[in-house]
Amino acid sequence: METTPYGNFPKNFLPSATFVLYKTDPEELIYPVNRQILLIAVLSGLILPSASGDLFPNSGPVASSKSARLRWGQAAAPQAAPVPVKRAIWAANQLQSKPYRYGGGHKSFKDHSYDCSGTVSYALAAAGLVSSPMSSTEFRRYGERGPGRWITIYAREGHTFAVIAGLRLDTTPFDRYTGRWAPRWYPAYRPPYGFDARHPIGL
């Protein structure tokens, strides 16, 4: 037998290895790759996308308007909005029945309760815009400075909320005298005094 460099074999798969070319019948092994490694690679490709898909919805209500519309507590995404914006809205709809808890949604996107930055993190994760939950302090440095066309995150020490396609995703009713603290959509404007406005690049 003769040893041949891996050549066109993917460099990110066993990069320091060489494969062995056996001069045998076609039915016999040509690339003696560890079966356990192959199994892990295949399962990773199948299971991980499925888990992500189960956590965040791929569809939801839409509206023909240019901005999101609130219907019985659920937001309908603008038909013309980019897919990431729609997915952020549909994901945030799932949190409307969740209670508020300080630190909620930070150990994992999937939680029983959420705080302000955990709520915003969840919506952005569904859109593929964050890879892990972020705190209010971290959101002050997120993306680019200023309001976005579709998504704007308002962050300061201790609180974060977002405006997505014209609706405010917040955990406080703002006036602090009515309602209760919980992830909710609000049509009412909240003055951003003291907040840093940030937005995802391109949105």
What are the functions of these language-model segments?
Residues 2, 31-34:
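N-terminal hydrophobic targeting signals that begin at the initiator methionine
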Residues 3-7, 14-16:
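Cationic, amphipathic, low-complexity segments that mediate targeting or membrane/lipid association
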Residues 11-12, 24:
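Polybasic, lysine-rich low-complexity intrinsically disordered segments
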Residues 18-22, 29-30:
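Short, positively charged and aromatic/hydrophobic N-terminal segments
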Residues 34-100, 175-203:
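Intrinsically disordered, low-complexity
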Residues 82-143:
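Secreted/periplasmic proteins that engage bacterial cell-wall peptidoglycan
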Residues 89, 121, 127-203:
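...with weaker cross-activation on analogous glycine-rich loops/strands in unrelated enzymes
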